[in-house]
From Swiss-Prot:
Record's protein name: Polymerase basic protein 2
HAMAP family, per database record: INV_PB2
Gene Ontology MF term list: RNA binding; RNA-directed RNA polymerase activity
Motif (Nuclear localization signal): 736-739
Family: Belongs to the influenza viruses PB2 family.
Record-marked site positions (Avian adaptation): 627
UniProt cross-references to InterPro entries, sorted A to Z: Flu_PB2_2nd (IPR049110), Flu_PB2_6th (IPR049114), Flu_PB2_C (IPR049115), Flu_PB2_CAP-bd (IPR048298), Flu_PB2_middle (IPR049111), Flu_PB2_N (IPR049106), INV_PB2 (IPR001591), PB2_helical (IPR049113)
Subunit structure: Influenza RNA polymerase is composed of three subunits: PB1, PB2 and PA. Interacts (via N-terminus) with PB1 (via C-terminus). Interacts with nucleoprotein NP (via N-terminus).
Keywords: Cap snatching, Eukaryotic host gene expression shutoff by virus, Eukaryotic host transcription shutoff by virus, Host gene expression shutoff by virus, Host nucleus, Host-virus interaction, Inhibition of host RNA polymerase II by virus, mRNA capping, mRNA processing, Viral transcription, Virion
Pfam family, one: Flu_PB2_1st
Main localisation: virion
Organism: Influenza A virus (strain A/Equine/Kentucky/2/1986 H3N8)
One record GO biological process: DNA-templated transcription
Name of the gene this protein is made from: PB2
Length: 759
């Protein structure tokens, strides 16, 4: 106060004011500070005094021909004096206005393409809905979040190569575009940005926004997907929140969400198979999410979630060093421990063999709805500070911490036998047994834990065994805090190993993850997940089995049709047709199979009755063990949508619809893919299928020996000719192609030539 008073007195004297306002700044240090280096030291001030001048802008001399000296109001737009020290003209800010209104216009077609992320953000905000503002204490915790909606997931290096290739294609320097996403993006962007007049550097910056995930460690209460983070400043303050529903979704959030669902489903399915690790890898490699291979997404996507991390570990990728227990992510922040096997008795006198952690340790625990700080020593909880959204979430965190502490009173609180099993009907390990037991009912645990009087500490209150808050007493060592505990910020990744039962360990042998930790929560994926592995088809019920079976046939049609003609039994026994059998009513399964197999045999025998769409449609029915009967069917029943639906043997139905015009197949209203050939080529097509790689030269020529069967064709060498027996005893002369490039057109030409050769 004294100093301020003194200053006021000084300022009231006119001499002081004069010294301060009129004296030149001639102190060398000050002059140095403001004049050394190219960096502007006070940009705001510089801008203010520059704009106060009449001609603060310099421009190329050509501007004098492009802009009049005065505008409509008679104000001068540029000065005849040259800019000191350069060959440029001094220009007024009014010239900018004139240029914007009357200057030449260029095509704006590229702007929405280059500034795509901004245009999309405006759309999202336009269609978003902002709800009421609520005033309440915000429990924010810092989380690593994605701040850049609408990006691909390329690494910085991959993006750099794409940007160089798109924006500066003629620059020297090695660029290797290897991944599928790199190639697709490069091709797409080159087409979009043809003849683009926007400054290349700007285009490069904007491309970077589109290609690379940018994460920040920010305090968040609520949604963490990028479409919420972009409006974080509008939706949550220190003591208020505003409800907001985004006006659109972005692909990167959808990928993150769909990846988690796919990974959870795959881990759950792998757990019950004979070799979980091998099955998991097979499924990861054969699954596509939104049209991208799941393994490619796993390599690039930094999402940390238990199931996703198990899949990454299986692929040999590094993952975060934190471990998971009871749905919480634990990160040790100090201390250390050694592990020792110990046997203990539960309250029910059941013996448990537990790996005890000996030593003092501190952990942060972060879950979706609660966070905590835990201090513990050998089999004793010293302190647990927990914060959460509601009573339920806080209770969940307390149970997990109490079990993790391995305290004797927790083990003695067990009532009844522990015999929880996993999906594969194997007993859970003791720690998860205890966890499941208390998650079902923690009353005895809380009652036996003990309570203690508490001191009045700012921002902390106690919690009683019935989970009600209190300012006097609390569960021993447990306090509830208003402040959240930040997520572990480091993005460090460590090398891990995984065993065949999908338990993930760090290099010291500590278990970081196991299938027990995978959440049961089931959402609906935002992007289409295609599990090509037939192990996964049943996951989404009968409809999914139906769609996936037909998609598999279409994808593998080339091989399927050859097997259909040459080795049908092998085809009928394919594992991919197994899930489909559960849809066919048990009573008619073998009758359908016998009927379809007979029908197929007739098609093979009678030339020209081959109908691709019909074979695809009926093939799955032929997989059941057949019953030889004379029964004919005009439609076959499948059990989907809770009732029997009919597939017509000839013609379309809601279940199976082939559109001749678009050549696309729709199963239960879902697109199942396109047929690459026209089924109506009356495709004497089995022959044409089998004769891929052969040229049909005409009618039989006896010089080339007796007619071979289709199966014997494989013996021919390139360029060799032979007579072949096709269909019902017709013989044509063929030659094995010398090169493979034109194989694609063979099936169409073969069909036409067979007809010509026979007629």
């Amino acid at each position: 106060m004294e100093r301020i008073k003194e200053l006021r007195d000084l300022m009231s004297q006119s001499r002081t004011r004069e010294i301060l306002t009129k004296t030149t700044v001639d102190h060398m240090a000050i002059i140095k500070k403001y004049t050394s280096g190219r960096q502007e030291k006070n940009p705001a001030l510089r801008m203010k005094w520059m704009m106060a001048m009449k001609y603060p802008i310099t421009a190329d001399k050509r501007i004098m021909e492009m802009i009049p000296e005065r505008n409509e109001q008679g104000q001068t737009l540029w000065s005849k004096t040259n800019d000191a020290g350069s060959d440029r003209v001094m220009v007024s800010p009014l010239a900018v206005t004139w240029w914007n209104r009357n200057g030449p216009t260029t095509s704006t077609i590229h702007y929405p393409k280059v500034y795509k992320t901004y245009f999309e953000k405006v759309e999202r905000l336009k269609h978003g809905t902002f709800g009421p503002v609520h005033f309440r204490n915000q429990v924010k915790i810092r989380r690593r979040v994605d701040v850049n909606p609408g990006h691909a997931d390329l690494s910085a290096k991959e993006a750099q190569d794409v940007i160089m290739e798109v924006v500066f294609p003629n620059e020297v320097g090695a660029r290797i575009l290897t991944s599928e996403s790199q190639l697709t993006i490069t091709k797409e962007k080159k087409e979009e940005l043809q003849d683009c007049k926007i400054a290349p550097l700007m285009v490069a910056y904007m491309l970077e926004r589109e290609l690379v995930r940018k994460t920040r460690f920010l305090p968040v209460a609520g949604g963490t997907s990028s479409v919420y983070i972009e409006v974080l400043h509008l939706t949550q303050g220190t003591c208020w929140e505003q409800m907001y529903t985004p006006g659109g979704e972005v692909r990167n959030d959808d990928i993150d969400q769909s990846l988690i669902i796919a990974a959870r489903n795959i881990v759950k399915r792998a757990t019950v198979s004979a070799d979980p690790l091998a099955s998991l890898l097979e499924m990861c490699h054969s699954t596509q999410i939104g049209g991208i291979r799941m393994v490619d997404i796993l390599k690039q996507n930094p999402t940390e979630e238990q199931a996703v991390d198990i899949c990454k570990a299986a692929m040999g990728l590094r993952i975060s060093s934190s471990f998971s227990f009871g749905g919480f992510t634990f990160k040790r922040t100090s201390g250390s421990s050694v592990k020792r096997e110990e046997e203990m008795l539960t309250g029910n006198l059941q013996t448990l063999k537990i790996r005890v952690h000996e030593g003092y340790e501190e952990f942060t625990m972060v879950g979706r709805r609660a966070t905590a700080i835990l201090r513990k020593t050998t089999r004793r909880l010293i302190q647990l500070i927990v914060s959460g959204r509601d009573e339920q979430s806080i209770a969940e965190a307390i149970i997990v911490a109490m079990v993790f502490s391995q305290e004797d009173c927790m083990i003695k609180a067990v009532r009844g036998d522990l015999n929880f099993v996993n999906r594969a009907n194997q007993r859970l390990n003791p720690m998860h047994q205890l966890l499941r037991h208390f998650q079902k009912d923690a009353k005895v645990l809380f009652q036996n834990w003990g309570i203690e009087p508490i001191d009045n500490v700012m921002g902390m209150i106690g919690i009683l065994p019935d989970m009600t808050p209190s300012t006097e007493m609390s569960l021993r060592g447990v306090r509830v805090s208003k402040m959240g505990v930040d997520e572990y910020s480091s993005t460090e990744r460590v090398v891990v190993s995984i065993d065949r039962f999908l338990r993930v360990r760090d290099q010291r042998g500590n278990i970081l993850l196991s299938p027990e930790e995978v959440s049961e929560t089931q959402g609906t994926e935002k992007l289409t997940i295609i599990y090509s592995s037939s192990m996964m088809w049943e996951i989404n019920g009968p409809e999914s089995v139906l769609v996936n079976t037909y998609q598999w046939i279409i994808r593998n049609w080339e091989i399927v049709k050859i097997q259909w003609s040459q080795d049908p039994t092998m085809l009928y026994n394919k594992i991919e047709f197994e899930p489909f059998q559960s849809l066919v009513p048990r009573a008619t399964r073998s009758q359908y199979s016998g009927f379809v197999r007979t029908l197929f045999q007739q098609m093979r025998d009678v030339l020209g009755t081959f109908d691709t769409a019909q074979i695809i449609k009926l093939l799955p029915f032929a997989a059941a063990p057949p019953e030889q009967s004379r029964m004919q069917f005009s439609s076959l029943t499948v059990n989907v949508r809770g009732s029997g639906m009919r597939i017509l043997v000839r013609g379309n139905s809601p279940v199976f619809n082939y559109n001749k015009a678009t050549k696309r197949l729709t199963v239960l209203g879902k697109d199942a893919g396109a047929l690459t050939e026209d089924p109506d080529e009356g495709t004497a097509g089995v022959e044409s299928a089998v004769l891929r790689g052969f040229l049909i030269l005409g009618k039989e020529n006896k010089r080339y020996g007796p007619a071979l069967s289709i199966n014997e064709l494989s013996k021919l060498t390139k360029g060799e000719k032979a007579n072949v027996l096709i269909g019902q005893g017709d013989v044509v002369l063929v030659m094995k192609r010398k090169r493979d490039s034109s194989i694609l057109t063979d099936s169409q030409t073969a069909t036409k030539r067979i007809r010509m050769a026979i007629n």
